[in-house]
Regions:
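Active-site clefts of carbohydrate-active enzymes
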Residues: 1-36, 52
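Generic hydrophobic/packing signal
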Residues: 7-8, 45, 62, 68
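Non-transmembrane alpha-helical segments in soluble domains
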Residues: 37-41
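Aromatic-rich peripheral "rim/lid" segments of glycoside hydrolase catalytic domains that contact
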Residues: 52-117
Length: 117
């Protein structure tokens, strides 16, 4: 199984929408990322997953009006430190999880209702 697109958004970055899966903060975005990726890696049929997307969407919206805080970086190319910290942790142990040497992350992010357009 290859997961082609997933994301988590929060409202603490100044953008008005979370996208498909809302969480409380940038740290929670990182926790959700780690939980999701490690669960996919631990699945016996898991091949990989692809985070969408690299940059936040512009506050005025893209062609269809979406303006979500779903990027690894803001629109000024600055990383979200709290999210990146969790991604680094996940990346450092993902192969051990995939190989069954380590259990996947069980910590879950604090979810909020989705805000999407």
């Amino acid at each position: 199984v290859m997961i082609g697109e997933f994301h988590f958004g929060a409202l603490d970055a100044g953008l008005p929408a979370t996208g498909l899966e809302g969480v409380l903060s940038q740290r929670d975005r990182g926790i959700a990322y780690c939980h999701y990726c490690e669960k996919a890696a631990a699945h016996p049929n898991g091949v990989g997953c692809h985070y969408f997307q690299c940059y936040d969407q512009f506050v005025l919206g893209r062609f269809d009006g979406e303006n979500y805080n779903i990027g690894l970086f803001d629109i000024c190319s600055q990383p979200y430190p709290d999210m990146m910290e969790q991604i680094k942790l996940c990346s450092s142990e993902i192969y051990e999880v995939a190989d069954g040497q380590k259990e996947p992350c069980e910590e879950k992010a604090d979810s909020i209702p989705m805000i999407a357009y």
